[in-house]
């Protein structure tokens, strides 16, 4: 659980504005999460998250004051790109990043909620499939969907996944789950706020890849 517990996201402020710098710093440590899933088929999601973080950071670094919050980025780019927006720049990168982050959130929440295949309780296929269905599937064409369906069958046992997530630390399953629940508090609130922002600014897109 050390992988997540060491980099908790900040509590969401009352105005629900997410500061870009601290957000990028926290989520930059999340791509190794997919290594814990074992299958190399999850590598594209990992690479997508890393690539989108890099794209957003490149924009942020040009003027940290102007792009202090994620909403600032969308607002500035909307004025900058005109008709091309939102399918451009850091706005597009954050669009896809939030989906990858939602996958992690739904997956971990499902495990914490005890959702499982009663015939194979130590498999995490049910949890990974739910996360894929809710976060990514509708944005993927049939070929990509087929690849990820195969990946779900290569997902590790829950016990092995939690051990990998804990970086080999000697902790009980319940201790690990409790730390995941703690991580999810601010993480879920932040992801929800990003989704709300995209809806309010009419920046959501539903094309497939």
Curated annotation (Swiss-Prot):
Stretches for region 2 X 12 AA approximate tandem repeats: 45-66
Pfam families given in the database record: GLTP
Keyword line: Acetylation, Cytoplasm, Lipid transport, Repeat, Transport
Gene3D superfamilies the record matches: Glycolipid transfer protein (1.10.3520.10)
UniProt Sequence repeat ranges: 45-55, 56-66
A single GO cellular-component term on record: cytosol
A molecular function GO annotation: ceramide 1-phosphate transfer activity
Modified residues (N-acetylalanine): 2
Residues binding beta-D-galactosyl-(1->4)-beta-D-glucosyl-(1<->1)-N-[(9Z)-octadecenoyl]-sphing-4-enine: 48-55, 140, 207
Tagged with keyword Cytoplasm: yes
Family recorded in the similarity comment: Belongs to the GLTP family.
Biological role stated in the UniProt entry: Accelerates the intermembrane transfer of various glycolipids. Catalyzes the transfer of various glycosphingolipids between membranes but does not catalyze the transfer of phospholipids. May be involved in the intracellular translocation of glucosylceramides.
Quaternary structure note: Monomer.
One of the protein's GO biological processes: response to immobilization stress
Species whose genome carries this gene: Rattus norvegicus
PANTHER family: GLYCOLIPID TRANSFER PROTEIN, GLYCOLIPID TRANSFER PROTEIN-RELATED
Protein name: Glycolipid transfer protein
Compartments reported by the entry: Cytoplasm
């Amino acid at each position: 659980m050390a992988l997540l517990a060491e980099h908790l996201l900040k509590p969401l402020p009352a105005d629900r504005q997410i500061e870009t710098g601290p957000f990028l710093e926290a989520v930059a440590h999340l791509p190794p999460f997919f290594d814990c899933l074992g299958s190399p088929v999850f590598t594209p999601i990992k690479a997508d998250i890393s690539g989108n973080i890099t794209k957003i950071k490149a924009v942020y670094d040009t003027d940290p004051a102007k792009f202090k919050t994620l909403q600032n980025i969308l607002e500035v780019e909307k004025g900058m790109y005109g008709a091309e927006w939102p399918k451009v720049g850091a706005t597009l990168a954050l669009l896809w990043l939030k989906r990858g982050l939602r996958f992690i959130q739904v997956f971990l929440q499902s495990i914490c909620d005890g959702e499982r295949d009663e015939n194979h309780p130590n498999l995490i296929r049910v949890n990974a499939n739910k996360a894929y269905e809710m976060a990514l599937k509708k944005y993927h064409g049939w070929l990509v969907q087929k690849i990820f369906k195969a990946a779900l069958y290569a997902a590790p046992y829950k016990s092995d996944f939690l051990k990998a997530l804990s970086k080999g630390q000697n902790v009980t399953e319940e201790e690990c789950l409790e730390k995941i629940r703690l991580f999810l508090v601010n993480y879920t609130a932040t992801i929800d706020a990003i989704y709300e922002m995209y809806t309010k600014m009419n920046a959501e897109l539903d094309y497939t890849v």
